[in-house]
Amino acid sequence: MESVEPPVKDGILYQQHVKFGKKCWRKVWALLYAGGPSGVARLESWDVRDGGLGPAGDRSTGPSRRGERRVIRLADCVSVLPADGESCPRDTGAFLITTTERSHLLAAQHRQSWVDPICQLAFPGTGECSSGSGQAESPKRGFVPMEENSIYSSWQEVTEFPVIVQRTEATSRCQLKGPYLLVLGQDDIQLRETSKPQACFSWPYRFLRKYGSDKGVFSFEAGRRCDSGEGLFAFSSPRAPDICGVVAAAIARQRERLPELAMSPPCPLPRALSLPSLEPPGELREVAPGFELPTPRKLPLTDPGPQSLPLLLSPTQEGPASGLYASVCKQTSKHTGTAEHLYENVCMLEASPGLTNGGPEAQEGPPGGRSPLGSPIYHNTEDLSWPGSAQDSNLEAQYRRLLELELDEAGSAGRSGAQAGIKAKLVTLLTRERKKGPAPCDRP
């Protein structure tokens, strides 16, 4: 049934809506009604179809020509602000009506002719429209000389703001609806009822994930550790930017009080009481039977020169003797300190009292198993078996070839006959040692 009360204002408006994820403007016929015995103050609108609705005095068209009816209760309005930054149809100006439920973006050819009556009906007794509409007409009233207020209190000292809760998933879960008082403390945000001083909910600043304000709505995202649980909370207020500024200042002050949160120095590592020793003292360890701890071999220091040294046996030998290498050095006429070594795996011999040169007293040398430059003996820790006849022929052929090359080199360089005699004795010695064969031993 059509309303019989006359509207305060009617005409064509454009309302923004989202269709398939795209913002578009819809042309509507709007009627602005004042509150009275027959109804509340409201703004009604219909979609314009088939030529649209005529003026208020000529509304004889039937209901078939009207689209969906939309009603905005002016008693639920929080703010009515111009929206200059929004793109709107040609030759129109946009304005935003924010209510407790949602926001409505409208556009009209004469924006101020709609904003003024809406503000007078939505905010009765104020004598002027909400912030923005009065500022739009202030230049037309002329310049008024003003003086600075020396006792002006900045907005940072204001900590209480009247707000209206916007409907979100988090506010619905917490059963928040209607007007409240938002109190901004030094450490948290508190929401109180207008008639009770007790706080309904509190959100510490350190538990807020995000916060901000847009189009007269202050919102923040609470974390899991808040009393209300995580979620988005939105509050409508004409001073939403001021609320956001107070929150930002409080967070900055809290960060200054806790400098370790902004920049925490790295924790130093514990300082060592003493440097590690290069040669740690001996330790007593329990080992399994048959296991030998690796120990550095002490090698003797001898003069370089052509010589054949006795075999080096382990002083703690329990099984077969380890295979050793006898080294033969060749002394050159120019470089007396450089030795070229030839190696032969001689045999495995048992301990003999005749080996006095290789005793433990004569085997003191640098630790680590490395032989010095003048030492012609290299110890082999592995247990090597005596080579077979095929290996003997290969070794003999290799050594003979090496000796022939050495003799040729010595002859070309004009070496003395004494050195050639030493080479011949060396061949005889190696042949005799090979014919002796390995000492008999019993292997498991």
From Swiss-Prot:
Q: What is the effect of changing Y325F?
A: Enhanced reduction of BCR-induced IL2 secretion. No effect on interaction with INPP5D SH2 domain. Abolishes interaction with CSK SH2 domain. No effect on BCR-triggered tyrosine phosphorylation
Residues forming coiled coils: none
The family database entries (InterPro entries) matched by this protein are listed as: Docking_Protein_DOK, Dok1/2/3_PTB, IRS_PTB, PH-like_dom_sf, PH_domain
Disulfide bond sites: none
Q: Residues annotated as region Disordered?
A: 278-299, 354-390
Q: How is it modified after translation?
A: Constitutively tyrosine-phosphorylated.
Single Gene Ontology BP annotation:
Ras protein signal transduction
Query: What exactly does this protein do?
Result: DOK proteins are enzymatically inert adaptor or scaffolding proteins. They provide a docking platform for the assembly of multimolecular signaling complexes. DOK3 is a negative regulator of JNK signaling in B-cells through interaction with INPP5D/SHIP1. May modulate ABL1 function.
Name the UniProt record assigns to this protein: Docking protein 3
Top-level taxonomy = Eukaryota, Metazoa, Chordata, Craniata, Vertebrata
